[in-house]
């Protein structure tokens, strides 16, 4: 029996007391962790445990959790488990740092390689990668110096300045360069809205009207598996807060999504485990927005569509075993950001 350790950064205490962390990150982390644990522990040949901050132990089944404070060393944990599945936000190098430390102890860490994590974490570098390979993606600029609409513009000392030309055409989407989920995102209509922002941390992307979709791609030694795409539900107040999603999507949307992700995969190194891709299917153009180098909330809906068997299949695929892609239900399944699923 394979013993699997799942470490979710917010819930484990690696980030300190979860009560002091952004609520959206803790909620998303807990949602993914519970769904993943449930899926893995339904497999007879797998056993999964997680590490929890003492303040969260009452919210998890006692048989699934190790309550350890302070967080033990990776070498100590590696002696009791065959595989580590880490989940963490990319922001401030948290995911990459966690993975690099854990690789020193664990022989198998179910996460993309460090170079791919670094590429996907930095949204500006992701943009340059996509452009270099001829993949459609919104124009993306660092706020401290960008060009658009024939002009050159800068944010200096928190003040927006037109260096040359006229004010660039909007609207844009403001994002943290290394943000996780919709952290810090908002719609920008006028350049003056950029005033007061900390330089070097933020980017602007041209706002593309259309339908937000995501697709999970599962890496393993025999090649990638493409999960059914999901519609993403975002708030309409300009903050783009993630509210959940649904699957399956229309056959036309599915073909368009698959066309983009297949092209993307050809530009990436091989990887293990989950890779999420966010896209916009527009009236005029379909674009890739971001790459997520770790588990995303859409796992909740996709695992339900797979009858609860998705996580064990990901493990077997990563180990190069005689794994079979799960069958996903054709019945509509909705899910929210808290992990609740709905079916007709």
At which residue positions do the language-model features occur?
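Conserved protein kinase catalytic/activation segment
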Residues: 285-287
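Active-site nucleotide/adenylate-binding loops and adjacent lid/helix of ATP-dependent enzymes
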Residues: 116-211, 219-227, 244-263
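A short glycine-rich, hydrophobically flanked beta-strand micro-motif that places a catalytic Asp/Glu
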Residues: 271-283
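ATP-dependent carboxylate/phosphate-activation module, predominantly the ATP-grasp catalytic core
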Residues: 205-269, 281, 292-319
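Short catalytic helix/loop segments, enriched in acidic residues and glycine
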Residues: 20-39
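Conserved N-proximal alpha/beta basic substrate-recognition cap immediately N-terminal to
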Residues: 39, 49-147, 164
